[in-house]
């Protein structure tokens, strides 16, 4: 009985350890800018149909790759754990 409790406790700690490693590694990956494929339209300035299309494709890639929110303005596309609304 004691060995079963010990094994279960060990499994819990090991799973927590790996969850922390995965969370930390993905949080570092998630804050970096993603490489935007050349097929995406890179536009500057105010929101237009082209920049809205770019941000839509950017956010789709961001969620597909990291499951993170996206900050997109003009030609800047960044996946992060939070969205900075600094308008």
From Swiss-Prot:
GO terms for cellular component: extracellular region. One of its GO terms (biological process) is killing of cells of another organism. The keyword Glycoprotein does not apply. Keywords: Antimicrobial, Disulfide bond, Fungicide, Plant defense, Secreted, Signal. Disulfide bonds join 55-72, 58-77, 62-79. Its main location: secreted. It is found in: Secreted. Residues 1-34 form the signal peptide. Belongs to the DEFL family. This is Defensin-like protein 223.
């Amino acid at each position: 009985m004691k060995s079963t409790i010990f094994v279960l406790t060990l499994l819990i700690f090991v799973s927590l350890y790996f969850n922390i490693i995965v969370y930390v590694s993905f949080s570092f990956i998630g804050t970096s800018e993603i490489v935007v494929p050349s097929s995406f339209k890179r536009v500057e300035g105010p929101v237009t149909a082209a920049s809205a299309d770019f941000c839509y494709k950017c956010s789709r890639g961001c969620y597909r790759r990291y499951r993170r929110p996206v900050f997109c303005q003009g030609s800047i596309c960044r996946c992060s754990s939070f969205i900075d609304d600094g308008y």
